[in-house]
């Protein structure tokens, strides 16, 4: 149960007060850095009055606020955030000074933090899906000696289930850095992306790979404008075609000069039918080569379909000279494949060409 003082602080923090009350808020312990603390009663995010709406990239969940308070050795705020609902175990993950560790234990944290609980917290932070959460995860787990007892296989499995992209790295630190970077790119958390890239300039290739894999053409466009694209358009197309429905990334690669026929062939190899027909809708035409590849990978129905070349044509509703990411996303927002629909209708009308496995 919250004490009367803690409850009063929570009520005050959940309401906006004019700057006339700044001195009172400082004395009341509701001041952090250069401004008063605000707690959103709905989403439980902590943010300053300078951001008068939730879900900005500067918001902090209670756990992230706790870790920041631990790092700054602010005992008053540590107690306050735990009273408001922050999990004191998050303060222990940072392996802070003895007096801070003792305080987190007094407030309910268990030490030592077990391996299973450590991995649960890693998952919880990854599932926050916020810029602050990604930065929190990087801060808590990279260079963290508590992870030395976790097997590489276990760590790989946990990170793959959260990031949905294969990760490689010689060390746990490199692996975790790429993991949090990938999450930032997946959700286009620009503040986190710039933070990671500033610290890991050698990870440009990984940044490109993730942006293509996660269909994030906002980041691709930024790199393109800065002339930091370091690989060929066709290699970019290879990464874009790894994941189904990566229409924006495929489109952007084509605008940079990647071959649509190459994209179509890659999509056949990857068994990504929707990407395949998107390439045809954009203008892929080398169906002889595509038919041979389809037969090689045992996609006989598709191979038979490519014999009917006159069935396919470019979808003229797809504008081919867009370069602004938002315009591309807007155009593709209502996209459905014209050629896929025609292929389905052809199979229905000609069941004799259908090969049943």
Swiss-Prot record:
Keywords: Host cytoplasm, Host-virus interaction, Inhibition of host innate immune response by virus, Inhibition of host IRF3 by virus, Inhibition of host RLR pathway by virus, Viral immunoevasion
Superkingdom, taxonomy of origin: Viruses
UniProt family annotation: Belongs to the asfivirus MGF 360 family.
Pfam family name, one: ASFV_360
Cross-referenced InterPro entries: ASFV_MGF360
Any one Gene Ontology cellular component term annotated for this protein: host cell cytoplasm
Name recorded for this polypeptide: Protein MGF 360-14L
Subcellular locations according to the entry: Host cytoplasm
Record note on quaternary structure: Interacts with host IRF3 and TRIM21; these interactions mediates degradation of IRF3 through TRIM21 and ubiquitin-meditated proteolysis.
Role: Plays a role in virus cell tropism, and may be required for efficient virus replication in macrophages. Also inhibits the host cGAS/STING-mediated type I interferon production by inducing host IRF3 degradation through the proteasome pathway.
Biological processes, Gene Ontology terms: symbiont-mediated suppression of host cytoplasmic pattern recognition receptor signaling pathway via inhibition of IRF3 activity; taxis
UniProt main location, coarse: host cell
């Amino acid at each position: 149960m919250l004490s009367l003082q803690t409850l009063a602080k929570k009520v005050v923090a959940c309401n906006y007060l004019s700057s006339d009350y700044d001195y009172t808020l400082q004395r009341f312990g509701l001041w952090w850095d250069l401004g008063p603390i605000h707690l959103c009663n709905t989403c439980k995010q902590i943010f300053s009055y300078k951001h008068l709406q939730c879900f900005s990239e500067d918001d902090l969940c209670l756990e992230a606020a706790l870790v920041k308070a631990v790092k700054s050795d602010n005992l008053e705020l540590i107690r306050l955030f735990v009273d408001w609902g922050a999990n004191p175990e998050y303060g222990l993950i940072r392996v802070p000074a003895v007096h801070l560790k003792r305080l987190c234990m007094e407030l309910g944290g268990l030490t030592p933090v077990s391996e299973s609980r450590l991995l649960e917290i890693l998952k919880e932070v990854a599932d926050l899906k916020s810029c602050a959460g990604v930065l929190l995860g990087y801060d808590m787990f990279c260079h963290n000696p508590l992870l030395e007892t976790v097997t590489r296989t276990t760590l790989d499995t946990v990170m793959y289930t959260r990031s949905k992209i294969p990760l490689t790295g010689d060390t746990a630190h490199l692996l975790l850095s790429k993991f949090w970077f990938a999450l930032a790119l997946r959700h286009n958390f620009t503040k986190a992306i710039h933070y990671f890239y500033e610290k890991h300039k050698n990870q440009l290739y990984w940044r490109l790979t993730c942006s293509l894999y996660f269909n994030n053409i906002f980041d691709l466009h930024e790199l393109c404008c800065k002339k930091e694209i370091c690989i060929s358009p066709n290699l970019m197309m290879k990464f874009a075609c790894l994941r189904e429905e990566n229409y924006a990334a495929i489109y952007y690669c084509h605008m940079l000069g990647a071959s649509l026929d190459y994209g179509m062939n890659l999509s056949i190899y990857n068994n990504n039918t929707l990407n395949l027909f998107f390439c045809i809708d954009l203008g892929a035409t080398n169906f002889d080569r595509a038919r041979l590849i389809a037969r090689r990978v045992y996609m006989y129905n598709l191979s038979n379909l490519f014999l009917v070349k006159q069935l396919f044509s470019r979808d003229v509703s797809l504008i081919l000279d867009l370069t602004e990411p938002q315009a591309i996303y807007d155009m593709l927002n209502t996209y459905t494949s014209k050629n896929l629909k025609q292929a389905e209708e052809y199979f229905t009308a000609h069941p004799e060409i259908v090969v049943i496995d």
